[in-house]
Amino acid sequence: MARYTGPVTRKSRRLRVDLVGGDRSFERRPYPPGQAGRARIKESEYLIQLQEKQKARFTYGVMEKQFRRYYAEANAMPGKTGDNLVILLEARLDNVIYRAGLARTRRQARQLVSHGHFTVNGKKINVPSFRVSQYDIIDVRDRSRSMLWFDEAQDNLVDANVPAWLQVVPSTLRILVHQLPERAQIDIPLQEQLIVEYYSK
């Protein structure tokens, strides 16, 4: 599947959000490229909505066509479309790996999933967009457990801030999906109502 592979810090500055997590270059200059200092240009309503949509896309590493499908599905579900959209994005396997602390960034999590290092309910899954469900069990494959990265991840789990809807067993790196998250449980600087307004035009 196609994905954005360009300079992430520049994209973070344009959208005014750290797409990497701990990006020091972004922290030093959290304003769009080409702007001097913190001066801001007055933006149209459409541009603000577009930027919020792009922020969501690049945060979760989703291409435009796939993002439109997520929105259409969220819009067809009961409840608030914006909440549904964020929950669908959070349920991606690569995001769950990131949230559980087994990857530093979503981009790294996407790579780990693509390389076939995980199983879901005993079945190997190498599709980052795979949607997890309540009570799913995610494991690192036996042949992957010896990788240096997973040794380091195991050590780092002691300090990991794992959301309440997930549980990680540090000794085995097993991830248990207790439930899909509610919007209030998702810590992300996103104004999803602006995305709804963008697609409602």
UniProtKB/Swiss-Prot annotation:
Q: Which Pfam families match?
A: Ribosomal_S4, S4
CDD domains hit by this protein: S4
Q: Which GO terms describe its biological process?
A: ribosomal small subunit biogenesis; translation
Q: List the disulfide bonds.
A: none
What's in the GO CC field? small ribosomal subunit
SUPFAM superfamilies linked: Alpha-L RNA-binding motif (SSF55174)
Going by the UniProt record, its keywords in alphabetical order are: Ribonucleoprotein, Ribosomal protein, RNA-binding, rRNA-binding
Tell me the HAMAP family matching this sequence: Ribosomal_uS4_B
Q: Which NCBIfam families match?
A: PRK05327.1, rpsD_bact
Give the family per the record. Answer: Belongs to the universal ribosomal protein uS4 family.
| The protein's name in its UniProt record | Small ribosomal subunit protein uS4
- State the species of origin: Corynebacterium urealyticum (strain ATCC 43042 / DSM 7109)
Taxonomy of origin reads: Bacteria, Bacillati, Actinomycetota, Actinomycetes, Mycobacteriales
